A protein has these predicted regions:
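Conserved alpha/beta-hydrolase
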Residues: 82-85, 93-117
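Short beta-strand/loop motif that positions the catalytic acidic residue
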Residues: 262, 268-270, 274
Length: 301
């Protein structure tokens, strides 16, 4: 048990839920519910096509919104089964653009509009794809530096980028929002009975995201047969990316293992009542061992 760093609250106002979104489940479901009720989450931008840079021929799609001169570029990375059109991506891009920041919403390999341009698919440790996207940009776009924000699994991808690739770019700061820093613990949590509906929703969307990937016969069979996220990771994600098993994948790509060595100022936000990602994985971190990290564990949100 570690905690510390001022009770993990930093110097931020307390979270106050707005009616009727009380509790972790309603706060998790809010944007999905609003979309089903007809709320539109649209924010047009300039389409960017960025080469993945690994010889695969895969291309990453992004949306760019211009800001005022002299401001750093902000790159947003979506979560599991998300994309540029996810409500949190749209809302953040609109807000930051209104403040004058240029914003790029990056679709990870195989996500959203990138699906038709990629044979491979993203995973929690694929920080090199963020590096490839930045390397493919006009250098002028990075002239004032870059800040990055990753949501959920996108936060895990971002942490791996910061650990292994950030030195190549003028990264000024980073933010993660509810990143699953202990992948094995998150996998166990989502398999719990209370998360049955969430799990069914996620596994169906994950299968749909992988349906257009370049898969062999054995992988196609696995895509039909898997029933849990752990099986999905064990039979599809891990073998396709050289990890072998889900357990190895979780060990190699969990963000917690890279936190002690991060050199970029990074704010890590999480809600203690999140139904998917255990708060105990954040409480287990020795935050005082790295002054570059600022944890914010809110009671809800």
């Amino acid at each position: 048990m570690h905690d510390s760093r001022a009770d993990m609250r930093a110097d931020f106002p307390a979270f106050r839920p707005r009616a009727p979104w009380w509790g972790g489940d309603l706060q998790t479901l809010r944007n999905t519910a609003l979309r089903k009720l007809g709320t539109r989450f649209d924010f047009p931008g300039e389409r960017l096509v960025l080469d993945a840079g690994d010889g695969s021929g895969d291309r990453l799609m992004a949306l760019f919104n211009e800001g005022k001169s002299g401001q750093p570029l902000v790159v947003l990375i979506h979560g599991l089964t998300g994309c540029e059109g996810s409500s949190y991506m749209v809302n953040t891009a609109r807000h930051l653009t209104g403040l004058g920041y240029p914003v790029m919403r990056l679709n990870m390999r195989g996500a959203g509009p990138s699906a038709d341009c990629c044979g491979q698919r993203y995973h929690a440790g694929r920080g090199q794809d963020i590096a490839a996207a930045l390397a493919a940009l006009d250098p002028v776009m990075l002239g004032c530096g870059v800040m990055l924000a990753g949501y959920s699994l996108g936060g895990s991808i971002l942490l791996n980028f910061l650990a292994h690739h950030a030195d190549t770019f003028p990264v000024r700061a980073a933010v993660t929002v509810s990143a699953p820093i202990d992948l094995a613990e998150c996998s166990r949590r989502i398999l719990g009975f209370r998360n049955f509906i969430y799990h069914r929703y996620l596994i169906d969307r994950m299968k749909n995201d992988w349906a257009g990937a370049a898969l062999g016969e054995r992988q196609r069979t696995a895509l039909v047969e898997v029933r849990t996220i752990w099986e999905f990771d064990d039979r599809l994600v891990a073998p396709a990316n050289g990890f072998g098993t889900a357990d190895n994948y979780y060990t190699e790509c969990s963000g917690a293992r890279v936190l002690p060595g991060l050199k970029i100022p990074t704010l890590m936000i999480h809600a203690a009542n999140d139904p998917w990602i255990p708060a105990k994985s954040y409480r287990a971190v020795d935050w005082d061992s790295n002054a570059k990290l600022t944890p914010l564990l809110a009671s809800g949100g």
